[in-house]
Amino acid sequence: MKRFLILTPMVLALCGCESPALLVQKDDAEFAPPANLVQPATVTEGGGLFQPAYNWSLLQDRRAYRIGDILTVILDESTQSSKQAKTNFGKKNDMSLGVPEVLGKKLNKFGGSISGKRDFDGSATSAQQNMLRGSITVAVHQVLPNGVLVIRGEKWLTLNQGDEYMRVTGLVRADDVARDNSVSSQRIANARISYAGRGALSDANSAGWLTRFFNHPLFPI
């Protein structure tokens, strides 16, 4: 009993101190541009119309397909889900005991009946809708042997009440990149899109430790 009284406050304290999410930091090395892969252009003399140092051809496709190239991701995400469940069951038991007789005399005190009934009725409804619109410019960090581009990038907005950030990673086919170096987020495979913030506004939308304490799955009520 004493051990239970000691462990219960410790478990409940851990439930309330649980962090809702890891704090995201700026200048993450994972999202840094691949600057070490950019080679300086060789400066050579040329004519007035043609400059060899400017590595571009009239017939060359300017869409992103190399490491270090830049492309813009058009965010067009919309999800909607709903779920409904209903369960009910019941159980009823009846049992009666007759009055026994001993030597021709009825023992009324030993007679009676037993009955039991249990009912359960539960229902649940869940609905969720998310929408994300906007754009973010990312860099090509790797080109796979089959030509698929590994893209990664982030955007930070510093506001007067905190910071907001957006991060995008995933795989893009070079054929899905438009001529203006843009690609829809719906064309990104293994997409990881994060949009959140930190600061006063983010803290106002986050549940406090006491709320998380009462809403934790280990809470007995």
Swiss-Prot record:
Signal peptide start and end residues: 1-16
Chain residues carrying a lipid of type N-palmitoyl cysteine: C17
GO cellular component terms, A-Z: bacterial-type flagellum basal body, distal rod, L ring; cell outer membrane
Membrane topology, from the record: Lipid-anchor
Subcellular locations according to the entry: Cell outer membrane; Bacterial flagellum basal body
Residues covalently joined to lipid (S-diacylglycerol cysteine): C17
Molecular function terms from GO: cytoskeletal motor activity
Keyword line: Bacterial flagellum, Cell outer membrane, Lipoprotein, Membrane, Palmitate, Signal
Any Pfam family hit: FlgH
GO BP, one annotated term: bacterial-type flagellum-dependent cell motility
Known partners and oligomeric status: The basal body constitutes a major portion of the flagellar organelle and consists of four rings (L,P,S, and M) mounted on a central rod.
Family: Belongs to the FlgH family.
HAMAP family: FlgH
Role, per record: Assembles around the rod to form the L-ring and probably protects the motor/basal body from shearing forces during rotation.
Protein name as it appears in the record: Flagellar L-ring protein 2
Species for this entry: Yersinia pseudotuberculosis serotype I (strain IP32953)
Lineage, uppermost ranks: Bacteria, Pseudomonadati, Pseudomonadota, Gammaproteobacteria, Enterobacterales
